[in-house]
Regions:
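Aromatic-rich, lipid-facing transmembrane alpha helices and their immediate juxtamembrane interface loops
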Residues: 1-258
């Protein structure tokens, strides 16, 4: 009964995370298949948890930071790490992976549906691009999360030594790149070994749309709490990425019209 209560409390405390998680599972099931997206989720969670566990103790890979424990008893913790924090890496990783696949792979259109033709599931280009896109999400997220006391997130963590990027350490972004690399590399290797991949992948746009919707949410919070300078930098990152994505989709539309 206690486990049920804490799970319910976690959902009520982090409804936006569960909403993104649900949308991620739907999008991922359509694009990768249910088996692959579940494997992706498990891989991402365990890699993320290990990275957070070690960083809060020895500062690797993100640099040293600490969870405040403010939400202890209100949400599920695994050791000193909030369960939902590590779990969020799964959908942030997939959103980045899906956008990287869209940018790199050939795109075809059938009516209103866009699909990837011969997706670059295992390419190094997708691996590194995903990791970069993964970091760029955190460039928007972390400065706002660090100011969680000013919105409904709460002050859930802090850096003992204030970082150069609006309080966030540069080692944090390096850590996100390495963890993103580890998640996608592990998934690519396992996916290839098990032979689960598909020659075509439908639902090519839902993952990228969710990538940008998450950014819109973070941008909204950034401006809501009055961090306009951070917001303008984040908005420029968002704008550059969405323009690149729109150009790729327009190219697919023009090819299908010929």
């Amino acid at each position: 009964m206690e486990i049920f209560d804490i799970l319910l409390s976690t959902i009520l405390l982090r409804p936006y995370v569960f909403l993104l998680l649900g949308l991620y599972l739907v999008a991922g099931s359509f694009q990768l298949g249910l088996k692959r997206i579940l494997v992706f989720t498990i891989l991402a969670y365990f890699i993320a948890f290990i990275s957070e566990y070690t960083s809060t103790r020895i500062g690797i890979p993100y640099g040293l930071y600490h969870y405040t424990g403010e939400t202890h008893g209100k949400e599920l913790f695994i050791s000193n790490v909030p369960f939902m924090d590590s779990l969020s890496y799964s959908f942030l990783g997939y959103f980045s992976y899906s956008l990287a696949l869209l940018i790199v792979s050939p795109v075809t259109r059938k009516g209103w549906e866009f699909e990837l033709s011969h997706p670059s599931w295992y390419s190094k280009k997708v691996l590194f691009l995903t990791s970069i896109l993964f970091v760029l999400q955190d460039v928007l997220i972390d400065p706002v999360s660090l100011r969680g006391s000013r919105w409904f997130l709460g002050q859930i963590y802090y850096y003992p030594v204030e970082g150069i990027y609006f309080g966030v350490t540069l080692s944090n972004f390096l850590g996100w790149f390495l963890v993103g690399l580890a998640i996608i590399y592990s998934f690519q290797k396992l996916d290839y070994k098990m032979g689960w991949s598909r020659e075509f992948a439908g639902n090519a746009l839902m993952g990228p749309v969710l990538y940008f919707l998450n950014m819109v949410f973070i941008l909204s919070v950034t401006f809501y709490i009055g961090e306009y300078f951070i917001g303008m930098i984040s908005l420029s990152i968002f704008s550059g990425l969405i323009i690149l994505t729109i150009l790729k989709v327009r190219r697919a539309l023009s090819i299908s019209a010929k």
